[in-house]
Amino acid sequence: MDQKILNKSLNNLLKNCAELNKNDSLLIISEDSKYGWYDKYISVAVYNYAKKKLGLNTQLLIVGEPENNSKNTIEKILDDYDCAIFFARIGDQERFEKPSSNTKRIMSYVRNIDSLCSSFASTNYLEMNKFKDAINKIIFNADN
């Protein structure tokens, strides 16, 4: 693992994607690694960078596997934070629904440190959005 690339990716996630500032609060929701989906080191790396490097008010919540009512517990505390980053499958349950809180939500599909250090994860999020918008414009303006 290259620490420089890791820091670039962490900054990309927290500053470019989440648009967090020093006075913001962050809840990191991490699925217990015993379920095999997410490596625990990913959420710990984000927590440490957010808290120590960016000075954010940061909390880490470890959750179990998704269940039909598991989102209810999280919904109760989401409004206490400016942003919630999910390293947990539970964050994907409401992908197409209207959010029930004003908290900014980010569902991360990065499952380990290696994928966080990938060229995709370290590429500037804002520039990737410009690229996506350009592609969408071409597609949506096509004649057939």
Regions found by a protein language model. Give the residues of each.
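Active-site bordering "gate/hinge" segments
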Residues: 1-144
